[in-house]
Structure formats: C-alpha cells, structure tokens
Regions:
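Non-catalytic, solvent-exposed segments at the cell envelope interface
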Residues: 2-13, 31-358
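Single-pass alpha-helical transmembrane signal-anchor segments
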Residues: 23-33
Length: 358
C-alpha cells in the first residue's frame, strides 16, 4: 500500500522536530558543562585554607603581646585601667559553653581584613565583621567586633581580639568569638588590605560622604585635595578612609569600614552579568576561605539573591554603655596598651536579638 503525501510530510516533520529537540538538548548540555567549567575555574582561584592551619606557640604569642607596648593608643585623656579589674581566665568571658551549632535560618559569614603585604605571613585581624543573613526576615546585618576588646583566647593568655587570628587563624578566631560572645560562624573570608584597594579600583571606586575632618585626614601626606561631601574614592583613598582612627575613635573607624562595605554592595548590585564576569576573575584570586567549593556554591545560590531586596542593619560589639576603654599599665613608666573591658553578657543579649529569626 502506498503512503499518502500527508503521511510523508508528517514523517518528515517528526524527523525535523526530533533533530531540533536533539540540537536544543545538546546546546543545553553544552551550556551546563560550560557554566560548570567556568564556575569551577573561578572557584579554583580562591585560596582554600585547611581548618587545622598553623598556630603559634604560647611563647611566640607572648612576644607579639609585648610588641603592643610600643604601639598602644596615644590618646592622653583616657584613664589607666586598674590592673586588678583586668579580666582573668575565669572572668574574661561567661563560664558556660557557647552554642556553636548551625542556627537554622541564620547564616553567619565572618569577613576578616588583615594588614598584610604580599609575601608576608599571617598578621593580626585589623577588621572583623560578621555578616548575618536572616532568611526568615530577609535582613542582612553587619556587626563589627572591636579589635581592642580584651577577651579570652582559648589555649592562650587573655588578650585583645585581633591577636586570635594571628595566633591561630580563622579557626581560633571563630572559637574566640564563640567562647566570648556565643557567636557561631558558618564560614570565613579573608582579604588583605593590599587586595582590598585593588577590588575597589576594579569596581571604579565607591561613593562615600566625607566630613571635612575626614577629607583632611585622607589628604594628609598626599597630593589629594578631597573636600567634604559626597566623593568617589578609589582604592588607596577608600583604604585610608577605612583606617582613620586617631581623628575620633576606633568605634567610628569600624563604622567607616562598614560604610565602604555597603558602598561596595551597592556597586555590585548595579552590575550586569557581563560586567560582573571580568571582576569575578580578579576578585576570586584575592580572597582565602575555610569553606569548600560545594559550600560556596550552595551559599551563593541561596544568599546572593537576598542582596537585591534585603534590609541592611549595622551593629558594633561591644555596644555603647557595655564597655570601658583605657590604657593598661603593665610596666613601671609605661602605659602598656589600650583595651576595652567588656560586659560580655550584655553583648551576648544583643547578639541573640540579631540572630533571632522570629
């Protein structure tokens, strides 16, 4: 029996449709492989740090502490703290173990800035900012932890928070935050200040509102001529702005660091995927982390969309009214170093409010 023309056309259409479907599936597969290859290549640029990274001996840590005798805060109107009131191993932090298990709809990523030049070893953490993603409320909180807070550093003598990172890296800093403040950290990201400048330049600078005193402080010792008001700061200027301290206080310094971080987020939110790609190529090589590739991908898929609509909040620990700052005299004729003595329980309460997902 002869096939009708209609049957022939139908057969050709089926073959054509099948070919088109196969081509589409092949393109989808090719695109998937290409995306996987690109993402894997990007993540391969990151420096992954073993959680059991090298730690300093207690003797080496003591040597680092004595270096602060020459680099203490020079402010003259601060009181000398009574050495008797300096926290001991028993009083520096609450005695009950701190909960460190995951907190459900809360994800805590710790951003650590260290003042280290290329080729140098691990230094003290100059900036410690906890980024808290609350998936229930859609809120992203930036909480700065003051580097001069006098804390219990597990395995070492009590000293300032910024020494924890130099003594034992990310893992010891995380443990220190858990013991003193009850903060569970899900992952860490470390950026050197030298790389921080490059990142800002890649994004074309950040927009910041300056006071005249801040502008004068940035201009000092440079050919720059910044004025008060809204300014676009390139990498070197933004870094100098972030590190202004003696103009007012370390408290304001931490606030400036968060200002720059939020300005960076605003810049990133305005970029297209095409604009983002060459920047990612550079940025990935600037950071180190203790998170795995799979963890980074999972968190990026889950949390990155929050950037476009999240409400941002800012906090500082210790919070006003819960600490006393002053110089500690440890040798005759020397002031010693500057530190904050803290009401830990009051600050734990504030942190519990930040982590509250209800």
């Amino acid at each position: 029996m002869k096939k009708s023309k209609t049957d022939g056309k139908s057969s050709r259409w089926k073959r054509t449709a099948l070919i088109i479907l196969c081509v589409i599936l092949a393109l989808v597969l090719l695109a998937t492989v290409a995306v996987y290859w690109y993402v894997d290549r990007l993540l391969g640029k990151i420096q992954y740090v073993d959680p059991s990274e090298a730690t300093l001996s207690t003797e080496e840590a003591v040597i680092l502490q004595t270096e602060d005798l020459e680099t203490m805060d020079p402010t003259e109107d601060l009181p000398l703290l009574d050495p008797i009131t300096i926290p001991t191993e028993e009083t520096a932090a609450p005695t009950e173990p701190a909960p460190t298990e995951p907190m459900g709809d809360i994800v805590n990523i710790l951003l650590i800035g260290q003042d280290r030049r290329e080729g140098e070893g691990r230094s003290r953490s100059d900036s410690t900012i906890l980024v808290t993603f609350n998936k229930t409320t859609g809120t992203i909180s930036l909480t700065s932890f003051m580097r001069d807070a006098y804390v219990q550093i597990p395995g070492y003598s009590n000293f300032k928070l910024n020494h924890a990172f130099q003594c034992g890296g990310m893992s010891l800093l995380n443990e220190t935050l858990a013991v003193n403040y009850g903060v569970p950290v899900d992952g860490d990201v470390v950026v050197d200040f030298f790389q921080f400048k490059k990142l800002i330049d890649l994004l074309g600078g950040v927009e910041v509102t300056l006071t005249q005193k801040e502008a004068d402080s940035i201009n000092a010792g440079s050919p720059w001529n910044l004025k008060a008001g809204r300014q676009i700061l390139d990498g070197p200027k933004a870094l100098k702005y972030s590190r202004i301290r003696y103009l007012d206080s370390d408290y304001r310094r931490a606030e400036r660091q968060r200002t720059v971080l939020l300005a960076l987020v605003d810049k990133i939110k305005g970029l297209s995927v095409i604009e983002m790609m060459p920047i990612l190529e550079e940025v990935m090589g600037m950071v180190s982390t203790n998170m795995s590739k799979d963890q980074i991908i999972s968190l990026a898929v889950e949390l990155f969309p929050m950037l476009t609509s999240a409400k941002f909040e800012q906090h500082q620990i210790p919070t006003p009214g819960t600490f006393k700052g002053g110089n500690v005299q440890v040798r005759p004729g020397l002031k010693g170093w500057f530190q904050y003595d803290i009401d830990f329980e009051a600050n734990r309460r504030l942190l519990r409010e930040i982590f509250d997902a209800d």
